[in-house]
């Protein structure tokens, strides 16, 4: 799906946009923003961001630098971490648990 959207936007950039002339009020242009959004966020969210951007690009709208927002960091709960930690093996675990710390006091 991303590939199809990519080529549709590229077709617009190469075939249609030169005939219309520069109209975008933002940097990067709306079509470049759409490409970056789709490649960064995937087809669904990237398309939503592109539509939202094109709707803001009008004579009474904003202008200037408007980059694609970075991909959000996915947070996981402590329960997910605990369940993943069950599968982690520690080398020499038995030796670590059976250390006699009184020998190190001298």
Curated annotation (Swiss-Prot):
InterPro entries: Membr_insert_effic_factor_YidD (IPR002696). Transmembrane segments: none annotated. Signal peptide: none annotated. Its main location: membrane. One of its GO terms (cellular component) is plasma membrane. Keywords: Cell inner membrane, Cell membrane, Membrane. It comes from the Bacteria. It is a peripheral membrane protein. It is found in: Cell inner membrane. Belongs to the UPF0161 family. Could be involved in insertion of integral membrane proteins into the membrane. NCBIfam families: membrane protein insertion efficiency factor YidD. PANTHER family: MEMBRANE PROTEIN INSERTION EFFICIENCY FACTOR-RELATED (PTHR33383:SF1). This is Putative membrane protein insertion efficiency factor.
């Amino acid at each position: 799906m991303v590939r199809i959207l990519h080529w549709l936007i590229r077709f617009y950039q190469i075939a249609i946009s030169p005939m219309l002339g520069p109209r975008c009020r933002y940097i990067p242009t709306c079509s470049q923003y759409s490409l970056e959004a789709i490649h960064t966020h995937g087809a669904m969210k990237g398309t939503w961001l592109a539509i939202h951007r094109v709707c803001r690009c009008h004579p009474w709208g904003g202008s200037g630098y408007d980059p694609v927002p970075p991909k959000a960091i996915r947070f996981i709960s402590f329960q997910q971490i605990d369940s993943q930690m069950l599968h982690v093996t520690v080398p020499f675990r038995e030796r670590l648990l059976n250390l006699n710390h009184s020998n190190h006091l001298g």
